[in-house]
Amino acid sequence: MIRFYANQAGYLPKGRKIAVLAQENRADEMEKMQDKQVSLWNEKGEQTAVKQAVYAGVDESAEDKVWHIDFSDLTEEGTVTFQDGEGAVLGSCIISSKAYHTLNQTLCKALYFQRCGMALEETFAGKFRRCTCHTGTAVRLEDYLERKENAKQYEVTGGWHDAGDYGRYTTAAATALAHMIYAQQFFPESFTENLNIPESNDAMPDVLSECLYELRWLLKMQMEDGSVCHKLTSMRHANFVMPCEDKRQMILFPASTMAAADFAAVMALASRVYRTWEPAFAAEVEDAAVRAWDWLMQHPQFIGFENPAGCNTGGYEDTSDLDERLWAAAELYVTTGNAAYLDKLEDYLKTNENPTDMGWVDVSGLAGLSCLFGAKKKEAKETQRFQVCQQKFRQAFLNEADKICDIADVSGYFVALTKEEYGWGSNMVVLNRAMILAVAHLLTGEARYQKMAQAQMDYILGVNATGYSYVTAVGTKSCQNPHNRVTVSDRIDETIPGFVVGGPNSAPIDEKAEWLITPDTPPMKCFLDVWECYSLNEITIYWNSPAIFVAAFLDKDA
């Protein structure tokens, strides 16, 4: 059987437009491996084009024979229907100049639905309204374990629930915030719409107001000595109940150098960006960034994090903090112009041969964004040294973007994943690589990078071997059952729109997926829209945030 895949959020009139026909590469599927003629029809029932579906070989990650239908020259907005040579309908898609603008609003609004510590009122949340949650105080881990009487209580309300659980994690928060803040700074025209959040209609763009809600919570994770707690969770994940029904004791887990460095970096970034609207807050977060940095300098050795015995909430473990320190040095230097930060920037950059990643495990690419695009305050004598750093970042981004293009070029679905790279959160890898492609395009203007970034979003939005749009409630076949305690518990048939789910995982670790996915399933098809499958179908803030960046990038030329 021939299957049809298109971007379910829509294609831009002036953009790359490729749909895919696919068929399993089996002996009993004997479709001739030759080009096919396909006709395209508009909403009025008029034939607008005849295209060739060009045979492109077998995609090894999907084990599909694939054909490509390139209709990039079609610019008329509206619904496009595809028919085969016998007049049978293959499928349809839309062309709209608002495709990515609308998508971006949905992706951003999803973060509002992750808010903790406040009621989500019907005015803003509609049918997904819910009551206030997690308003109690927290205690330090050591006091909790010792059952210390009269333990010091910490007020840590606010922020976003990180994922399908109710924990809040410093490194994850900092990464997501950076993606979103940089997206607004680079592509402000994509963030002009009212998101219908409580802060709407003030002078600040709504996306920055949403980030501010998370930043104000993140400030509370810093201790008196400048250190930053790694996470705020209960000892074990909550049951599948609504947030307001989760009454477990919240615990502040010990500081890590990764958390302190990420905190310093994102607070320095925030101090630059929020100076226009919230000057007092900007000064506060710059001071917090400096205090976190000073603590880091007093602790030059890596201080990692491991969950204590009996704890099953997210660990966000790492083996090095050099990339986090690099990011912190870059943001603080760009923000303050203090040459001491440049010294450290140079030192840390020497330890990283490929500073391009922008996920929570490796944030070195975020240092590159700061150095290449941030507002720079520096003395003339430092200019040459800083330019050397900039050149290293620039070349690293371009080299990595070329590698990503090479991977996508040999994929029948144009996705920048090798057969071995379909692991937990594979969609995050796709989106982070799309961010790198976007940066490469910003640096060079080369169309190849923009087209490949578009191809990655096509994959996320339905041009893949499962046919799913991996964004909840976006598209004709979108994920409806994410691993999300709110969605499972709210007794509402519809799912909250706008969450990116983890995606195919050829080595799932949850019991349901291990049972339902057979060992011989091709990697790209190792996906189920089943809420129990947390290693396939969970959500998290830092899977939405790169999607926001890439959607805004694509929207800028709509």
What are these regions (language model features)?
Residues 199, 203:
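Acidic, glycine-anchored loop motifs typical of Ca2+
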Residues 205-227:
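Carboxylate/His-rich catalytic cores and anion/metal-binding grooves
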Residues 191-198, 228, 280-282:
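Short, glycine/acidic-rich hinge or "gate" loops at secondary-structure transitions
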Residues 357-359:
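Zinc-dependent metallopeptidase catalytic helix centered on the HExxH motif
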Residues 4-91, 98-99, 109-174, 178, ...:
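Aromatic (Trp/Tyr) and acidic
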